[in-house]
């Protein structure tokens, strides 16, 4: 697992190289990583950047470059839009995520939601498993004002310390050429 999941972040993170480069708010949240498992960064991107990404997503949908999936997702927009790719590759965000993992992060996917997915509690690691375990990290970027009825992301504090559940734990065997046959509700 990543170093902040193995150690107590409250005692070790402040001595880590480059810790001082982060704002005091981010530093305080990093010290709580071991117990929380997430950071809440406000206004990392400007309103203009957010507006630009929203326009880019709308253009991709209207030009039919990327269809909206059955669950209101626009997947891999960064492959078709330099604006979305620029946000995904944001240097400050990558430095923070790399600091948390103590490895250089490699962004590999964007999901834009037309409206909140309303997805139930789940673990992303069952679908995107890293080897060794513990090196999956995500950034959820709100591109609109968030309220309880908008289908916002939720996270259970400390759930990053729970044992990993993998597809094999559900007898849902997949190969490179075949996906398993389990439904979402089976998980």
Regions found by a protein language model. Name each.
Residues 39, 145, 153:
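Short beta-strand segments in beta-sandwich/barrel cores
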Residues 87-88, 134, 182-187:
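A general structural signal for short secondary-structure boundary/capping elements
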Residues 103, 116-118, 145-148, 161:
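Short, charged/polar surface micro-motifs in flexible loops or helix N-caps
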Residues 130-148:
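Short, conserved beta-strand element in jelly-roll/cupin
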Residues 149-187:
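Double-stranded beta-helix
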């Amino acid at each position: 697992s990543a170093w902040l999941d193995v150690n107590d972040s409250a005692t070790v993170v402040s001595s880590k190289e480059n810790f001082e480069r982060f704002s005091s708010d981010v530093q305080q949240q990093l010290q709580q990583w071991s117990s929380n498992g997430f950071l809440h960064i406000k206004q990392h991107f400007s309103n203009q950047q957010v507006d630009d990404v929203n326009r880019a997503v709308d253009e991709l949908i209207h030009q039919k470059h990327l269809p909206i999936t059955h669950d209101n997702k626009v997947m891999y927009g960064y492959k078709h839009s330099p604006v979305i790719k620029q946000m995904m590759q944001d240097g400050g965000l990558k430095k923070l995520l790399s600091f948390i993992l103590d490895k250089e992060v490699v962004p590999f996917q964007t999901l834009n939601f037309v409206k909140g997915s309303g997805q139930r509690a789940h673990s992303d690691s069952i679908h995107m498993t890293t080897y060794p375990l513990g090196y999956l990290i995500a950034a959820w970027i709100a591109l609109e004002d968030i309220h309880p009825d908008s289908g916002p992301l939720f996270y259970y504090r400390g759930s990053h310390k729970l044992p990993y559940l993998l597809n094999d734990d559900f007898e849902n065997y997949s190969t490179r050429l075949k996906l398993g046959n389990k439904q979402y509700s089976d998980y």
